[in-house]
Amino acid sequence: MASSRQDYIAPWWTYWLHNFPHLNFNFQTVDNTFKPEDASYQQSLVFLACVSAVALGLCLLLLSVYLTCLCCCRREEDEEVKRPDTCCVTWAAVITGLVICSAVGVGFYGNSETNDGVYQLTYSIYNANHTLGGIGSMVGNSLGSMQVGLKEHLERLDEIFSPRGDYTQTLRFMQQMADNIIQQLTAMPETRKVQVDLAAIADRTAFIEYYRWLTYLLLLILDLVICLLACLALAKQSRWLLTVIMVCGMLTLIMSWASLGAGTATAVGTSDFCVSPDKYIVNQTKGTLSSDIVHYYLYCSQSLPNPFQQSLTIFQRSLTTMQIQVQGLLQFAVVVFPTAEKDLLGIQRLLNSSEFNLHQLTALLDCRSLHKDYLEALLGVCYDGVEGLLYLCLFSLLAACAFCALLCAVPRAWMLIAIRDRDYDDIDEEDPFNPTRRFNAYNPSRAQVHSFCSYSSSMGSQTSLQPPLQATSSTPEYMNQSMLFERNPRYENVPLIGSGSPPPSYSPSMRTTYLSMTDAQIRHFGTDFQV
């Protein structure tokens, strides 16, 4: 039936999803025709969602095995590796971050596309519901006018025209025309029940879509936050941040696989509908609407006759006949019975109102309006909606794989940071080769003896207040330094390089420099230095 449509063609991805294997819980093949009320068909969709659950279980199992092996092999690696190689962890973190960012971009696009498709669906349903409401309103108003208003006027006129048999005969003929109109309007399908069903479907769909969109939005934001926290944790080498990332990453991994299963099942079910939507609608309306009416609105072809054309024609002819009769009574009967003018004018206004309702009803019953809403709903669901679901499934798959890799890299990074901290804690403070010890020896803030040296020669005259480096040096080292400077008087007063020992003696220039110090400088450097 779907192949005969000239104005709607299901996209190729719906056929691809429609051909997915449909298996029940007994691993038996199920018909892929869209039948959401059928238990076997429901099991086939749940089975597709369970595939993601199985993948999640395998992923968690592999992570458990990896973490166990990592913990068991930790001691051996610590003994063999003096300086752990962080290249693999760094590249894994970089690639994982890029994949997560790409997945989030795909997810935002898919979430927006799905939301646009569902919005177009609900908008079309509300428009169709408004059209059906207008049809019901026009039919109801016309029935009320014929059954109540016209009947009252005819009863009063029958009393007034009782002396004249020809006039009463005209009134009976008008009553027959009104009965014909009532019969045709009553034969029209009841649209109130359909209207209520469409309104409920649209409201429920909009409610579900809002929370679906919000859930995916929060999941996308959570993925970005975890990615940023991972970068921050690796940059600051913070173990507690890595622990938080492990917990949040595990939760996000579970949610990613769950969203993949739900998205796959929804996309396959929607594609089953999109491949043959007419067949499903015909089956659903069976017993409520005739097949002629359903086909008329589903296809809206010029070759299909309007099923309401005969009723509308009888309605129009009956109104025209009644208007002619009323016009004749106004022309001839009012002269004899002046009191009948009021009721005749009332009937004329009622017939004019019914004719206006007839024109509106004819326009509303035309297939083009409802068929347009039907096509827009199909395009919204089967094009934007299913396409967005595919992008969301791709996002979930990429995010699940990326977080699986992240959960493998984070424990390794945590161990490398722990090894680094342990190595720093194991440094011997008394070790003469300790870089920290050598730094403290040359750190002016930790010196106890302050030295002041005056440099003069071709370099210029400069008074310098330099605290000495506290360290002891042997005589050979000092002599080696003297040989280094080749007994140049220019470097006579330079403190020994590489040693914390002061010069063996102080020159008069140094004493002069010290005596020229201000009180503030003396308070700053203390009284440790004595000349």
Swiss-Prot record:
Subcellular compartments: Cell membrane
One Pfam family this chain carries? Tweety
What ranges are annotated Cytoplasmic (topological domains)?
66-87, 235-239, 411-531
GO CC terms, sorted: chloride channel complex; plasma membrane
Membrane-traversing stretches: 45-65, 88-108, 214-234, 240-260, 390-410
The segments annotated as topological domain Extracellular are: 1-44, 109-213, 261-389
UniProt keyword list: Calcium, Cell membrane, Chloride, Chloride channel, Glycoprotein, Ion channel, Ion transport, Membrane, Transmembrane, Transmembrane helix, Transport
Topology versus the membrane, per the UniProt entry? Multi-pass membrane protein
Primary location class: membrane
Q: Name one GO molecular function term.
A: intracellularly calcium-gated chloride channel activity
Q: Which residues are glycosylated?
A: N129, N283, N352
Family according to the record: Belongs to the tweety family.
- PANTHER family named in the record: PROTEIN TWEETY HOMOLOG 2-LIKE, TWEETY-RELATED
Entry function: Probable large-conductance Ca(2+)-activated chloride channel.
| Protein's UniProt name | Protein tweety homolog 2-like
**Organism per entry:** Danio rerio
Upper lineage? Eukaryota, Metazoa, Chordata, Craniata, Vertebrata
What's the name of its gene? ttyh2l
